Amino acid sequence: MMESIKKLREMTGAGMMDVKKALADAEGNEDKAIALLRERGIAKAVKKGDREAKEGIVRFAVDGNRAAMVEVNSETDFVARNADFQATVEKLAQAALQAKTNDVEEFKNFTVDGETVGNMVAATAGKIGENIVLNRVAYLEGQQVAGYVHSNGKIGVLVDLAGGDEAKAKDVALHVAAERPQFLTRDEVESGDIEKEREILTNKALAEGKPQQIVEKIVEGQIGKFYQERVLPEQTFVKDNSLTVAKYLGDASVNKFVRFEIGA
Protein backbone atom coordinates (compact mmCIF):
# COMPACT_ATOMS: atom_id res chain seq x y z
CA MET A 1 0.00 0.00 0.00
CA MET A 2 2.75 2.47 0.97
CA GLU A 3 4.60 1.71 -2.26
CA SER A 4 1.46 2.52 -4.29
CA ILE A 5 0.90 5.73 -2.31
CA LYS A 6 4.48 6.83 -2.96
CA LYS A 7 4.26 6.01 -6.67
CA LEU A 8 0.93 7.80 -7.19
CA ARG A 9 2.11 10.86 -5.27
CA GLU A 10 5.12 11.10 -7.58
CA MET A 11 2.99 10.57 -10.68
CA THR A 12 0.12 12.93 -9.83
CA GLY A 13 1.50 15.53 -7.44
CA ALA A 14 -1.42 14.81 -5.06
CA GLY A 15 -1.13 14.77 -1.25
CA MET A 16 -0.72 11.61 0.80
CA MET A 17 -4.23 11.55 2.30
CA ASP A 18 -5.86 12.25 -1.07
CA VAL A 19 -3.90 9.42 -2.68
CA LYS A 20 -4.64 7.06 0.22
CA LYS A 21 -8.39 7.75 -0.01
CA ALA A 22 -8.41 7.35 -3.79
CA LEU A 23 -6.61 4.01 -3.54
CA ALA A 24 -9.07 2.84 -0.90
CA ASP A 25 -12.05 3.92 -3.02
CA ALA A 26 -10.50 2.18 -6.04
CA GLU A 27 -9.84 -0.98 -4.00
CA GLY A 28 -6.11 -0.70 -4.65
CA ASN A 29 -6.36 -0.31 -8.44
CA GLU A 30 -3.77 2.36 -9.30
CA ASP A 31 -5.24 3.36 -12.68
CA LYS A 32 -8.71 3.79 -11.15
CA ALA A 33 -7.21 5.77 -8.27
CA ILE A 34 -5.52 8.15 -10.73
CA ALA A 35 -8.84 8.62 -12.55
CA LEU A 36 -10.58 9.39 -9.24
CA LEU A 37 -7.91 11.93 -8.30
CA ARG A 38 -8.35 13.64 -11.65
CA GLU A 39 -12.14 13.67 -11.35
CA ARG A 40 -11.76 15.30 -7.95
CA GLY A 41 -9.50 17.95 -9.45
CA ILE A 42 -6.58 16.84 -7.31
CA ALA A 43 -4.27 15.32 -9.92
CA LYS A 44 -2.88 16.61 -13.17
CA ALA A 45 -3.08 14.46 -16.32
CA VAL A 46 -0.60 11.61 -16.16
CA LYS A 47 1.23 10.59 -19.29
CA LYS A 48 2.05 6.98 -19.88
CA GLY A 49 5.72 6.37 -19.40
CA ASP A 50 6.22 8.57 -16.33
CA ARG A 51 7.31 5.52 -14.39
CA GLU A 52 10.58 3.96 -13.36
CA ALA A 53 13.84 5.50 -14.61
CA LYS A 54 16.84 3.57 -15.87
CA GLU A 55 20.30 4.82 -16.78
CA GLY A 56 21.93 4.67 -20.20
CA ILE A 57 22.19 6.67 -23.41
CA VAL A 58 20.58 7.02 -26.83
CA ARG A 59 22.61 7.47 -30.03
CA PHE A 60 21.67 7.76 -33.71
CA ALA A 61 23.36 7.58 -37.10
CA VAL A 62 22.22 9.13 -40.40
CA ASP A 63 23.25 8.23 -43.94
CA GLY A 64 21.42 10.22 -46.61
CA ASN A 65 17.75 9.33 -46.43
CA ARG A 66 18.33 6.58 -43.86
CA ALA A 67 18.68 6.78 -40.10
CA ALA A 68 18.96 4.40 -37.15
CA MET A 69 18.84 4.85 -33.40
CA VAL A 70 19.61 2.67 -30.38
CA GLU A 71 18.91 2.87 -26.65
CA VAL A 72 21.33 1.04 -24.40
CA ASN A 73 20.71 0.84 -20.66
CA SER A 74 23.23 0.61 -17.84
CA GLU A 75 22.78 0.22 -14.11
CA THR A 76 24.38 3.56 -13.20
CA ASP A 77 24.82 6.99 -14.71
CA PHE A 78 28.54 6.67 -13.98
CA VAL A 79 28.78 3.85 -16.53
CA ALA A 80 26.55 5.74 -18.98
CA ARG A 81 29.27 8.40 -19.04
CA ASN A 82 32.08 5.83 -19.45
CA ALA A 83 34.07 6.28 -22.69
CA ASP A 84 34.07 2.54 -23.55
CA PHE A 85 30.32 2.33 -23.01
CA GLN A 86 29.67 5.39 -25.19
CA ALA A 87 31.96 4.10 -27.94
CA THR A 88 30.05 0.81 -27.99
CA VAL A 89 26.70 2.59 -28.28
CA GLU A 90 28.03 4.75 -31.14
CA LYS A 91 29.18 1.58 -32.92
CA LEU A 92 25.77 -0.01 -32.34
CA ALA A 93 24.02 2.99 -33.92
CA GLN A 94 26.19 2.60 -37.03
CA ALA A 95 25.52 -1.14 -37.07
CA ALA A 96 21.78 -0.49 -36.88
CA LEU A 97 22.05 1.44 -40.16
CA GLN A 98 23.32 -1.74 -41.79
CA ALA A 99 20.92 -4.09 -40.00
CA LYS A 100 17.82 -2.13 -41.13
CA THR A 101 15.61 -3.53 -38.37
CA ASN A 102 13.29 -2.34 -35.60
CA ASP A 103 13.47 -5.68 -33.79
CA VAL A 104 15.94 -5.89 -30.90
CA GLU A 105 16.29 -9.68 -30.97
CA GLU A 106 16.96 -9.65 -34.70
CA PHE A 107 19.51 -6.88 -34.21
CA LYS A 108 21.31 -8.83 -31.47
CA ASN A 109 22.01 -11.57 -34.04
CA PHE A 110 23.36 -9.12 -36.63
CA THR A 111 27.09 -9.51 -37.25
CA VAL A 112 29.56 -6.61 -37.27
CA ASP A 113 33.23 -7.31 -38.03
CA GLY A 114 32.73 -11.00 -37.30
CA GLU A 115 30.99 -10.43 -33.96
CA THR A 116 27.27 -10.43 -33.22
CA VAL A 117 25.74 -7.31 -31.70
CA GLY A 118 24.65 -9.39 -28.70
CA ASN A 119 28.23 -10.53 -28.07
CA MET A 120 29.50 -6.98 -28.49
CA VAL A 121 27.13 -5.80 -25.75
CA ALA A 122 28.09 -8.73 -23.50
CA ALA A 123 31.80 -8.06 -24.00
CA THR A 124 31.37 -4.42 -23.05
CA ALA A 125 29.40 -5.44 -19.96
CA GLY A 126 32.19 -7.82 -18.95
CA LYS A 127 34.83 -5.16 -19.46
CA ILE A 128 32.95 -2.50 -17.49
CA GLY A 129 31.65 -4.85 -14.82
CA GLU A 130 28.01 -3.79 -14.98
CA ASN A 131 24.87 -5.22 -16.57
CA ILE A 132 24.22 -3.58 -19.94
CA VAL A 133 21.01 -4.03 -21.94
CA LEU A 134 20.31 -3.21 -25.58
CA ASN A 135 16.76 -2.01 -24.99
CA ARG A 136 15.51 -0.57 -28.30
CA VAL A 137 16.50 -0.10 -31.92
CA ALA A 138 14.80 1.93 -34.66
CA TYR A 139 15.41 2.17 -38.39
CA LEU A 140 13.92 4.82 -40.65
CA GLU A 141 14.17 5.20 -44.41
CA GLY A 142 12.33 8.06 -46.06
CA GLN A 143 12.57 11.39 -47.81
CA GLN A 144 14.00 14.09 -45.52
CA VAL A 145 15.48 12.30 -42.52
CA ALA A 146 17.09 13.86 -39.44
CA GLY A 147 18.04 12.88 -35.92
CA TYR A 148 18.52 14.66 -32.61
CA VAL A 149 19.95 13.61 -29.26
CA HIS A 150 19.53 15.81 -26.21
CA SER A 151 22.82 16.98 -24.70
CA ASN A 152 22.64 14.52 -21.80
CA GLY A 153 22.08 11.61 -24.18
CA LYS A 154 18.89 10.53 -22.41
CA ILE A 155 16.50 11.48 -25.25
CA GLY A 156 16.85 10.71 -28.95
CA VAL A 157 14.58 11.34 -31.93
CA LEU A 158 14.40 10.34 -35.59
CA VAL A 159 12.13 12.24 -37.98
CA ASP A 160 11.19 11.77 -41.63
CA LEU A 161 9.52 14.64 -43.50
CA ALA A 162 7.66 14.71 -46.79
CA GLY A 163 8.94 17.94 -48.33
CA GLY A 164 10.83 20.54 -46.36
CA ASP A 165 14.59 20.54 -45.86
CA GLU A 166 17.18 19.26 -43.41
CA ALA A 167 16.86 22.33 -41.18
CA LYS A 168 13.11 21.81 -40.78
CA ALA A 169 13.57 18.10 -40.13
CA LYS A 170 16.12 18.88 -37.40
CA ASP A 171 13.82 21.51 -35.88
CA VAL A 172 10.96 19.02 -35.73
CA ALA A 173 13.26 16.40 -34.18
CA LEU A 174 14.25 18.91 -31.48
CA HIS A 175 10.56 19.70 -30.93
CA VAL A 176 9.67 16.02 -30.54
CA ALA A 177 12.46 15.62 -27.97
CA ALA A 178 11.18 18.56 -25.92
CA GLU A 179 7.40 18.21 -26.24
CA ARG A 180 6.90 14.42 -26.20
CA PRO A 181 4.14 14.00 -28.81
CA GLN A 182 2.50 10.60 -28.63
CA PHE A 183 0.72 10.49 -31.98
CA LEU A 184 1.14 11.63 -35.57
CA THR A 185 -2.60 12.00 -36.23
CA ARG A 186 -5.82 12.06 -34.20
CA ASP A 187 -6.78 8.74 -35.77
CA GLU A 188 -3.95 7.04 -33.88
CA VAL A 189 -5.54 7.87 -30.51
CA GLU A 190 -7.55 4.92 -29.19
CA SER A 191 -11.27 5.78 -29.12
CA GLY A 192 -11.48 4.12 -25.70
CA ASP A 193 -8.85 6.52 -24.35
CA ILE A 194 -10.86 9.50 -25.61
CA GLU A 195 -14.06 8.18 -24.05
CA LYS A 196 -12.26 7.58 -20.76
CA GLU A 197 -10.87 11.13 -20.85
CA ARG A 198 -14.31 12.54 -21.70
CA GLU A 199 -15.86 10.67 -18.76
CA ILE A 200 -13.21 11.94 -16.33
CA LEU A 201 -13.58 15.53 -17.54
CA THR A 202 -17.39 15.35 -17.43
CA ASN A 203 -17.41 14.00 -13.87
CA LYS A 204 -14.90 16.64 -12.82
CA ALA A 205 -16.96 19.50 -14.33
CA LEU A 206 -20.16 18.24 -12.70
CA ALA A 207 -18.40 17.83 -9.36
CA GLU A 208 -17.29 21.46 -9.61
CA GLY A 209 -20.93 22.47 -9.93
CA LYS A 210 -20.85 23.47 -13.59
CA PRO A 211 -24.36 23.67 -15.17
CA GLN A 212 -25.24 20.55 -17.15
CA GLN A 213 -26.01 22.60 -20.28
CA ILE A 214 -22.45 23.94 -20.55
CA VAL A 215 -20.57 20.85 -19.37
CA GLU A 216 -20.51 19.35 -22.86
CA LYS A 217 -18.96 22.50 -24.36
CA ILE A 218 -16.37 22.64 -21.59
CA VAL A 219 -15.50 18.98 -22.07
CA GLU A 220 -15.20 19.24 -25.87
CA GLY A 221 -12.88 22.21 -25.45
CA GLN A 222 -10.73 20.19 -23.09
CA ILE A 223 -10.76 17.21 -25.46
CA GLY A 224 -9.42 19.56 -28.13
CA LYS A 225 -6.65 20.50 -25.73
CA PHE A 226 -6.05 16.79 -25.07
CA TYR A 227 -5.30 16.35 -28.78
CA GLN A 228 -3.21 19.52 -28.97
CA GLU A 229 -0.95 18.26 -26.21
CA ARG A 230 -0.39 14.84 -27.80
CA VAL A 231 -0.75 14.99 -31.61
CA LEU A 232 2.47 16.28 -33.18
CA PRO A 233 1.15 18.58 -35.96
CA GLU A 234 -1.30 20.21 -33.51
CA GLN A 235 1.29 20.97 -30.83
CA THR A 236 2.58 24.50 -30.27
CA PHE A 237 5.97 24.67 -31.99
CA VAL A 238 8.74 24.74 -29.39
CA LYS A 239 10.83 27.40 -31.18
CA ASP A 240 7.90 29.76 -31.92
CA ASN A 241 4.80 29.57 -29.73
CA SER A 242 2.80 31.60 -32.25
CA LEU A 243 2.82 28.57 -34.57
CA THR A 244 1.70 24.97 -34.46
CA VAL A 245 4.10 22.37 -35.86
CA ALA A 246 1.83 22.01 -38.91
CA LYS A 247 1.95 25.77 -39.59
CA TYR A 248 5.72 25.84 -39.14
CA LEU A 249 6.09 23.05 -41.70
CA GLY A 250 3.86 24.75 -44.27
CA ASP A 251 3.71 22.52 -47.36
CA ALA A 252 5.85 19.87 -45.69
CA SER A 253 4.50 17.19 -43.36
CA VAL A 254 5.79 14.51 -41.01
CA ASN A 255 5.81 10.98 -42.41
CA LYS A 256 7.04 9.39 -39.22
CA PHE A 257 8.83 10.08 -35.96
CA VAL A 258 10.48 7.86 -33.36
CA ARG A 259 11.34 9.05 -29.85
CA PHE A 260 13.41 7.16 -27.28
CA GLU A 261 13.80 8.34 -23.69
CA ILE A 262 15.75 6.49 -21.04
CA GLY A 263 13.29 5.08 -18.53
CA ALA A 264 10.17 5.82 -20.60
Swiss-Prot record:
Keywords of this entry: Cytoplasm, Elongation factor, Protein biosynthesis
Alphabetical list of Gene3D superfamilies matching this protein: 1.10.286.20, DNA helicase RuvA subunit, C-terminal domain, Elongation factor Ts, dimerisation domain
Record localization: Cytoplasm
Region named Involved in Mg(2+) ion dislocation from EF-Tu: 76-79
Major localization listed first in the record, in broad terms: cytoplasm
Keyword Amino-acid biosynthesis appears in the UniProt entry: no
Task of the protein: Associates with the EF-Tu.GDP complex and induces the exchange of GDP to GTP. It remains bound to the aminoacyl-tRNA.EF-Tu.GTP complex up to the GTP hydrolysis stage on the ribosome.
Any one GO molecular-function label of the UniProt entry: translation elongation factor activity
GO terms for biological process, alphabetical: translational elongation
A GO cellular component entry from the record: cytoplasm
Protein name as it appears in the record: Elongation factor Ts
Family named by the database record: Belongs to the EF-Ts family.
Stored NCBIfam families: tsf (TIGR00116)
InterPro entries named in the record: EF-Ts_dimer_sf, Transl_elong_EFTs/EF1B, Transl_elong_EFTs/EF1B_dimer, Transl_elong_Ts_CS, UBA-like_sf
